[in-house]
């Protein structure tokens, strides 16, 4: 990751671009992945790692780290606060990042861990994006959006992103 400050700066920069410096409405779709670390599918994660890493020793090492996590839900989850977990969730979520940018063609997308925003001047466009996002997360990554944490609002109404309210 590149840190909260970069994400916050990009948020402001994107909001300025989408709103054409406050000359038009900037809509923001804000979402949160439900039980993020606990829901990471270990098999899917290893398959993603195998697509990017050819060295079998490295793959085995990552597999051991992933499988060392004791969970009530077998084959699911990564330990919170572990440095390798932070790297691995970004490897995992990179699949989603690529989908949002290249398949959904969303230029103004920012993700920080399990929180993400997509900005657009067209509210209906963002409404149409929601089922696509849900389907991809569900089918490809076995993740779900937190049902109470999907918000569609204008930037001027004040958007809480990463603990900072932007308007």
Where in this protein do the model-derived segments appear?
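Conserved polymerase palm-domain catalytic core
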Residues: 2, 6-113, 117-153, 158
């Amino acid at each position: 990751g590149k840190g909260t400050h970069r994400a916050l700066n990009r948020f402001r920069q994107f909001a300025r671009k989408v709103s054409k410096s406050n000359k038009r409405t900037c809509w923001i779709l804000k979402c949160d992945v439900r039980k993020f670390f606990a829901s990471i599918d270990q098999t899917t994660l290893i398959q993603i790692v195998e697509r990017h890493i050819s060295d079998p020793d490295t793959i085995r090492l990552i597999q051991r780290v992933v499988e060392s996590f004791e969970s009530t839900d077998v084959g699911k989850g990564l330990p919170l606060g572990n440095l390798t977990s932070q790297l691995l969730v970004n490897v995992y979520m990179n699949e989603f990042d690529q989908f949002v940018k290249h398949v959904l063609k969303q230029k103004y997308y920012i993700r920080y861990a399990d929180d993400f925003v997509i900005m657009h001047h067209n509210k209906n466009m963002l409404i149409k994006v929601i089922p696509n996002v849900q389907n991809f997360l569900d089918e490809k990554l076995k993740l779900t959006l937190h049902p109470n944490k999907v918000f569609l609002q204008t930037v001027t109404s004040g958007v809480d992103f990463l603990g900072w309210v932007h308007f």
